[in-house]
Curated annotation (Swiss-Prot):
A single MF term (Gene Ontology): translation release factor activity, codon specific
Compartments reported by the entry: Cytoplasm
Protein name: Peptide chain release factor 1
InterPro entries per the UniProt record, alphabetical: PCRF, Pep_chain_release_fac_I, Pep_chain_release_fac_I_sf, Prokaryotic/Mito_RF, RF-1
Residue(s) carrying N5-methylglutamine: Q235
Classification via Gene3D superfamilies: 3.30.160.20, 3.30.70.1660, 6.10.140.1950
Function: Peptide chain release factor 1 directs the termination of translation in response to the peptide chain termination codons UAG and UAA.
Organism annotation: Azoarcus sp. (strain BH72)
PTM entry text: Methylated by PrmC. Methylation increases the termination efficiency of RF1.
Length: 361
C-alpha cells in the first residue's frame, strides 16, 4: 500500500474516533442539524475504517506467519498462513482503493427519470412505455417509490414523453449511468409483414435538487402559462386551467405538468423538474469536460450517444459502452438490472482508479 493512502486511512481512523467522542457528548443533540451531519459523516467513514482495520490485521497475521518460517516444524503452517494473509491483503487493498474514490455528492439523492420517444413513431412510444415499466419494476425491487410527474401518452399506448420521480436511498447512484440513447430491434405490433424494425428512445436521469433554493432561478427568467389539461385526468380536470407550462427563457427549457388536478401542485412539480434539468445541465457540462480529459465513456453526460440495444428476436441486450451482452432480455425488461448496473459501476470505478494513478495519488 502506498504511504499516501496509508496516511489518509490513518487520518480517517482518527476522524472516526473524534466523531464518536462528539456524538457521545452531552451537547451532541442540542443542534439536531449538526447531529445529523455528524451521524452521516460517521456512517460514511465507519465501513472504510473497518476495512482498514481488517487490512492491518492481515498485515499482522502475515508478520506472525513469517516468524513461523524460521521453525522447521512450523514452516508448512507458516507458508499456508502467509499465503492466506497475502491474498487477504491483496483483496482488501483493492477494496480500500475503491472505498477512497471521490464520492458523487448526488449519489444519495432522489431522481427524475425522463424518457422521450425518438425515431420509430408509435413503436418508439411503445418502447418508451416498456422502459418506464422496466425502471419502475427495478425501483419496486429496491423498495423505492415511483411517481409520474408528467406524461404525454401516444395513441397506441406507451408515451411520447414521460417524466417520473423516483424516491429512495441511493436511487441516483444506481441509475445515473442510464442516460443516453436506448435502441430497440423487434417486430412492431403494427407490422403485418413480420419485418424487424429499429426504434429509439432517449433516457435522461437527473438528480433531484435538495431544495429549489439550491438552484438559482430568477423569476424574471420564467414564463408561466396555464391551460386546460388533456388526456388522463377525468372530466373534472378539463374544466379548469390546472395544467402548467414553465419556460426558462435564457435556456429555452420547457416543462409541462398536468397530471394533478391542482394547478398549485402541477406548478410545484414543474419547478422541481426545471430545477433538476438546470442542475443536470451544469453536471453534464462538468462530466463532458472530465470525459474529454480522461477519454471516459461511462458518465460522459452525452445524451446523443447510443448506449444500449435491446434485440428482441435474439433475446439479447448489449451495452455498447462496456461491450457487455446478456442473453436475458426478458429478465432485464422485468426490471432485473443488477448485473448491468453493477458492471457499469465497476467500469466507472476502474476509470476513476486509472485517473488517480495518472495523477500519482
Amino acid at each position: 500500500m502506498k504511504q499516501s493512502i496509508r496516511d489518509k486511512l490513518e487520518h480517517l481512523a482518527g476522524r472516526l474516533a473524534e466523531l464518536d467522542r462528539e456524538l457521545s457528548s452531552e451537547d451532541a443533540t442540542r443542534d439536531m442539524n449538526a447531529f445529523r451531519d455528524l451521524s452521516r459523516e460517521r456512517a460514511e467513514l465507519e465501513p472504510v475504517v473497518a476495512l482498514y482495520g481488517a487490512y492491518r490485521q492481515a498485515e499482522q497475521d502475515c508478520a506472525t506467519a513469517r516468524e513461523l518460517l524460521d521453525d522447521p516444524e512450523m514452516q508448512e503452517l507458516g507458508r499456508s498462513e502467509l499465503e492466506a494473509g497475502e491474498a487477504r491483503i491483496a483483496a482488501l487493498d483493492g477494496d480500500l482503493q475503491r472505498a477512497l474514490l471521490p464520492r458523487d455528492p448526488n449519489d444519495e439523492r432522489n431522481l427524475f427519470l425522463e424518457i422521450r420517444a425518438g425515431t420509430g413513431g408509435d413503436e418508439a412510444a411503445l418502447f418508451a412505455g416498456d422502459l418506464l415499466r422496466m425502471y419502475s419494476r427495478y425501483a419496486e425491487r429496491q423498495r423505492w417509490r415511483v411517481e409520474i410527474v408528467s406524461s404525454n401518452p401516444s395513441d397506441l399506448g406507451g408515451y411520447k414523453e414521460v417524466i417520473a420521480r423516483i424516491v429512495g436511498a441511493g436511487a441516483y447512484s444506481r441509475l445515473k449511468f442510464e442516460s443516453g440513447g436506448h435502441r430497440v430491434q423487434r417486430i412492431p405490433v403494427t407490422e403485418t409483414q413480420g419485418r424487424i424494425h429499429t426504434s429509439a428512445c432517449t433516457v435522461a436521469v437527473m438528480p433531484e435538487a435538495d431544495e429549489l433554493a439550491a438552484v438559482e432561478i430568477n423569476p424574471a427568467d420564467l414564463r408561466i402559462d396555464t391551460f386546460r389539461a388533456s388526456g388522463a385526468g377525468g372530466q373534472h380536470i378539463n374544466k379548469t386551467d390546472s395544467a402548467v407550462r414553465i419556460t426558462h427563457l435564457p435556456t429555452g427549457l420547457v416543462v409541462e405538468c398536468q397530471d394533478d388536478r391542482s394547478q398549485h401542485r402541477n406548478k410545484a412539480q414543474a419547478m422541481a423538474v426545471l430545477a433538476a434539468r438546470l442542475n443536470d445541465a451544469q453536471l453534464r457540462a462538468r462530466q463532458s469536460a472530465e470525459a474529454a480529459t480522461r477519454r471516459s465513456l461511462i458518465g460522459s453526460g452525452d445524451r446523443s450517444e447510443r448506449i444500449r440495444t435491446y434485440n428482441f428476436p435474439q433475446g439479447r441486450v448489449t451495452d455498447h459502452r462496456i461491450n457487455l451482452t446478456l442473453y436475458k432480455l426478458d429478465a432485464v425488461m422485468q426490471g432485473e438490472l443488477d448485473e448491468l448496473l453493477a458492471a457499469l459501476v465497476l467500469e466507472h470505478q476502474a476509470e476513476q482508479l486509472a485517473a488517480l494513478a495518472e495523477e500519482g495519488l
